[in-house]
Design a protein with these regions (language model features):
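Bacterial Sec-dependent signal peptides at the C-terminal "C-region" and cleavage site
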Residues: 12-23
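Surface-exposed, charged secondary-structure patches
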Residues: 22-38, 66-122, 133-136
Length: 530
């Protein structure tokens, strides 16, 4: 009897979860072309007609918050759609609609014998909104694809509702900044005094950030408390770093070659380059026991050692996770170093956060990404020994800025307090209690938590509207390095012209001209204020 009851319960649960599909079996052209988001079917039809008509400017209105920022803005021009594609779409047969737990739905359309479109929709703000398209191989496979992903889609949807909700009352935030905010340099130096390791989560090629770090470097308190600085450059180049800092004459070519070895096209962060030179200059004025040790932590392919396509494939397949390599190098260095002073790790904020969302852009193809270096180091060294700082940045992805953190709430607070540089603890603050949304994609993962789950401190340096353009190290592009990039492209089957949007022969002059023209007279985040 108990077994029978269990079977009945399981069957009931499965039936409740897997709602019976609603059969449609009509071609798209059988339905009117209207903008209607009232039901999953109508919303799916609306999305299909947006594709047929190339209406790029309407996708944001038809899509949910969790993908909206990726989509063209309202002034986007129509896309030209060829007649073959239009006919194919219009003749597609809408097979069925499935609703999952009243919040997730899909419309399955047979485009041709081999391609089934699965339009995914969520119920948000009283409307059924698009969150993307999946593909199936036949009707049954399309159902399986939808049901397999539906539970996670539902979790992301619930999280997106939380992330989307933002307070319009700034009083508590403004009061906290006024009561507890301190000067950023004092804040960072205090953290470096009280913690064996401070992780500074930065945004690359940001002059204001490197100027701040350089100012902190030259403060006498820094060399009293800090002996090691870890940087996000290739760890296999440590011997070259040691050679650079051991030299009695400033040899910038050593440093430039290190920068050229980071990624296939080099690393053109001028602020980091100048900071590393300033460490060399400072060390010349210090006794040996007070000098700063630079340790590189990133895992990158040793391109100069790779001579063939097969070398590249083997090296890439065996590449350790970047975050794990960073954590390994830091942990090992802290264990063996004789210098009792504390340490600073300067790394992109995407490698710094503490929550247990796996890191991005870190694992070799086919491998599961590990936790970030920040999360791993907290696990290994304890939360008390690691202090993680985030600087104020736009909301975005690894590909660029998309909007504002908490939809501009933090920016509004800093404006109300005079846009003066300030830093504060996130724990116990209204800022720390806000859902973490710095990384747009990651923010919809329920494991992301809030700001205090990811960082301990927050630093505001300047308003985003005043941000200088990317601080570019033009010096890395020499004629020999252009030849080396071409060689790297050949063994990796890549296209350098595509990377830099260059027609014809790739030259250093063309690369430099493209960057200078792109940034001339512009602020870095100008598109956010249009």
């Amino acid at each position: 009897m108990k077994k029978l009851l269990c079977v009945l319960v399981i069957c009931f649960v499965m039936t409740a979860v897997k709602t019976q599909p609603v059969t449609i079996n009509k071609q798209l052209k059988d339905f009117q072309d209207t903008f209607d988001l009232s039901t999953p079917l109508n919303a799916g039809i609306t999305c299909s007609y947006l594709i047929v008509n190339g209406k790029e400017n309407l996708w944001r209105n038809a899509s949910a918050y969790m993908i909206r920022e990726y989509l063209p803005k309202s002034k986007a021009p129509d896309r030209t759609v060829n007649e073959t594609k239009k006919t194919r779409m219009l003749n597609g047969t809408i097979k069925e609609v499935i609703v999952y737990k009243d919040s997730i739905a899909c419309m399955i359309t047979q485009i041709d014998s081999a391609y089934y479109s699965i339009r995914i929709l969520v119920f948000e703000d009283g409307k059924w909104l698009n969150i993307g398209e999946d593909m199936g191989r036949g009707l049954e496979n399309s159902r399986e694809v939808f049901y397999a992903k539906a539970p996670n889609t539902l979790r992301e949807h619930h999280r997106s509702i939380e992330v989307k909700s933002v307070s319009t009352d700034t009083l508590a935030f403004v009061s906290y900044v006024k009561q507890y905010g301190v000067e950023p340099k004092d804040f960072l130096l205090e953290a470096l005094t009280t913690h064996p390791l401070v992780i500074y989560g930065e945004l690359h090629r940001r002059k204001v950030s490197w100027d701040f770090l350089t100012s902190t470097l030259y403060d006498p308190r820094f060399t009293e408390k800090v002996g090691t600085v870890f940087v996000e450059l290739p760890s296999y180049q440590q011997s070259e770093f040691d050679r650079f800092y051991a030299s009695k004459e400033l040899d910038t070519e050593i440093l430039l070659e290190i920068m050229r070895s980071e990624q296939i096209y080099g690393w053109w962060d001028r602020g980091e380059y100048e900071f590393l030179i300033n460490v060399w200059k400072l060390n010349q004025t210090l006794p040996s026991d007070k000098q700063i040790k630079i340790v590189s932590v990133d895992e990158q392919l040793p391109y100069k050692l790779l001579k063939t396509a097969e070398d590249f494939k083997q090296s890439e397949a065996s590449l350790p996770d970047r975050n794990t390599n960073m954590a390994n190098v830091v942990e090992k260095t802290l264990k063996i170093k004789i210098d009792k002073r504390n340490s600073l790790l300067i790394v992109g904020y995407g490698h710094a956060y503490k929550s247990h969302v796996p890191g991005g852009s870190s694992a070799a193809q086919g491998q599961e990404p590990a936790l970030t270096a920040g999360a791993q180091l907290v696990q290994r060294l304890s939360d008390n020994n690691v202090f993680v700082v985030l600087q104020h940045v736009p909301m975005g992805t690894n590909s660029g800025a998309l909007g504002f953190i908490r939809q501009g709430l933090f920016d509004a607070v800093f404006e109300k307090t005079g846009n003066k540089p300030v830093a504060f603890h996130l724990g116990g603050s209204p800022f720390g209690a806000e859902p973490y949304d710095v990384d747009y994609t990651m923010s919809f993962d329920s494991r992301a938590g809030n700001f205090a789950d990811n960082f301990d401190g927050y630093i505001f340096l300047n308003p985003l509207k005043d941000e200088d353009p990317d601080y570019i190290l033009y010096d890395i592009w020499s004629d020999p390095f252009i030849d080396e990039m071409k060689r790297r492209a050949a063994i990796t089957n890549d296209n350098m012209n595509r990377w830099f949007s260059i027609e014809g022969e790739l030259t250093k002059e063309k690369i430099i001209t493209i960057f200078k023209e792109e940034y001339k007279g512009k602020k870095r985040w100008s598109q956010l204020f249009e």
